């Protein structure tokens, strides 16, 4: 067979992408495929495959449904970050802003909707509704319906127990008085120097999934609830 480098995909006229693997494969695929190309995710890993629409045992039925037009689009909000004018790839799940030095707890500032908050903490997690069943859920944040146009702010090990906050989809600016890492969907890491401003905002267009089964809160069902 033949293979295509990720950068080549953006120059090819594609109608549909199949992501075969786990959720990590799906997240990675959305960062490298052309923005408006829909994706069908097939889970063949050992994990839940929360983002997937089909498993290894239902691939034939899924492809038949797509070829016969029995499918629909599922749009998901994405976000991007800008660090001193340099824009990162889009994130479908989340951005984690976290300290590097494990012996000092930094003071991080958070500005959104004309308000500013400062707190000593290990990090800040900014999640989309899609990401609310990922890292955000593991740190105790609530699950959001996938269709909502909002963001979840989850402080990590806040000294004064700063609560999680759900806000409308507005720009969020983050700073730290110590060097930090900015992690995109748990996969790509960008170093942020102390005092640098990180601005998180909506990315257009939304991610497009191909779905064949209508469900209310599909990600919640994958968690076993």
Predicted regions and their residues:
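Short glycine-/acidic-enriched loop or helix-start segments at secondary-structure transitions
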Residues: 28-30, 50-51, 107, 136-138, ...
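ATP/nucleoside-binding phosphotransfer catalytic cores, i.e., glycine-rich phosphate-binding loops
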Residues: 84, 89, 97-98, 102, ...
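Short glycine-rich anion-binding loops that position phosphate/pyrophosphate groups of nucleotides
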Residues: 22-25, 45, 130-133
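Short, solvent-exposed amphipathic alpha-helical segments in soluble enzyme
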Residues: 34-35, 140-144, 170, 215
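Catalytic core of DAGKc-family lipid kinases
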Residues: 45-122
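N-terminal glycine-/serine-/threonine-rich phosphate-binding loop
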Residues: 1-35, 68-69
């Amino acid at each position: 067979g033949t293979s295509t480098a990720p950068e080549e995909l953006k120059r090819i006229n594609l109608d549909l992408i199949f992501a075969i693997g786990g959720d990590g494969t799906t997240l990675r695929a959305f960062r490298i495929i052309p923005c408006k190309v829909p994706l069908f995710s097939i889970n063949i890993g050992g994990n839940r495959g929360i983002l997937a629409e089909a498993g290894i045992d239902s691939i034939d039925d899924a492809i038949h449904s797509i070829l016969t037009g029995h499918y629909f689009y599922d749009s998901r909000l994405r976000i991007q970050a800008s660090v001193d004018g340099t824009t990162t790839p889009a994130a479908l799940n989340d951005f984690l802003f976290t300290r590097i030095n494990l012996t000092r707890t930094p003071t991080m500032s958070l500005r959104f909707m004309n308000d500013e908050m400062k707190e000593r903490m290990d990090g800040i997690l900014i999640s989309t509704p899609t990401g609310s069943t990922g890292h955000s859920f593991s740190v105790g944040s609530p699950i959001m319906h996938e269709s909502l146009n909002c963001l979840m702010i989850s402080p990590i090990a806040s000294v004064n127990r700063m609560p999680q906050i759900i806000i409308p989809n507005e720009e969020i600016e983050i700073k730290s008085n110590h060097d930090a890492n900015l992690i995109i969907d748990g996969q790509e890491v960008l170093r942020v120097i102390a005092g640098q401003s990180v601005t998180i905002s909506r990315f257009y267009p939304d991610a497009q999934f191909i779905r064949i089964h209508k469900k209310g809160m599909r990600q919640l069902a994958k968690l076993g609830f």
